[in-house]
């Protein structure tokens, strides 16, 4: 169980749920610029395994690093923290 605590855990927003058992999660982070010392926003998309297809487009989710599940999937869904409001 201690090995799982060393895995990376990110929080992001689902931007695509069109694939079966796979979602695309956009994770936004901030880094400081070396020269100017200003915070710069970076974003990255991760393909994530969603076994039961519970996450929908716009949901805020937590994902965890795992073994390679396919050519592009390296993360799995931990939980849906906030559901999207559908208007």
From Swiss-Prot:
It holds the Pfam family Ribosomal_S17. It comes from the Bacteria. The keyword Ribonucleoprotein applies. SUPFAM superfamilies: Nucleic acid-binding proteins. GO terms for cellular component: cytosolic small ribosomal subunit. GO terms for biological process: translation. Keywords: Ribonucleoprotein, Ribosomal protein, RNA-binding, rRNA-binding. GO terms for molecular function: rRNA binding; structural constituent of ribosome. InterPro entries: NA-bd_OB-fold, Ribosomal_uS17, Ribosomal_uS17_bact/chlr, Ribosomal_uS17_CS. Belongs to the universal ribosomal protein uS17 family. HAMAP family: Ribosomal_uS17_B (MF_01345_B). PANTHER family: 40S RIBOSOMAL PROTEIN S11 FAMILY MEMBER, SMALL RIBOSOMAL SUBUNIT PROTEIN US17M. One of the primary rRNA binding proteins, it binds specifically to the 5'-end of 16S ribosomal RNA. Part of the 30S ribosomal subunit. This is Small ribosomal subunit protein uS17. It comes from Oceanobacillus iheyensis (strain DSM 14371 / CIP 107618 / JCM 11309 / KCTC 3954 / HTE831).
């Amino acid at each position: 169980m201690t090995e799982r605590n060393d895995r990376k855990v990110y929080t992001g927003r689902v931007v695509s749920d069109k694939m079966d058992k796979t979602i695309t999660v956009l994770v936004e982070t901030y880094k400081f610029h070396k020269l100017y010392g200003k915070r710069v926003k970076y974003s990255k998309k991760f393909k994530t395994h969603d076994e039961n297809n519970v996450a929908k487009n716009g949901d805020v989710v937590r994902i965890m690093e795992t073994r390679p599940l396919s050519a592009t999937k390296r993360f799995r869904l931990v939980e849906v923290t906030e559901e999207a409001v559908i208007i």
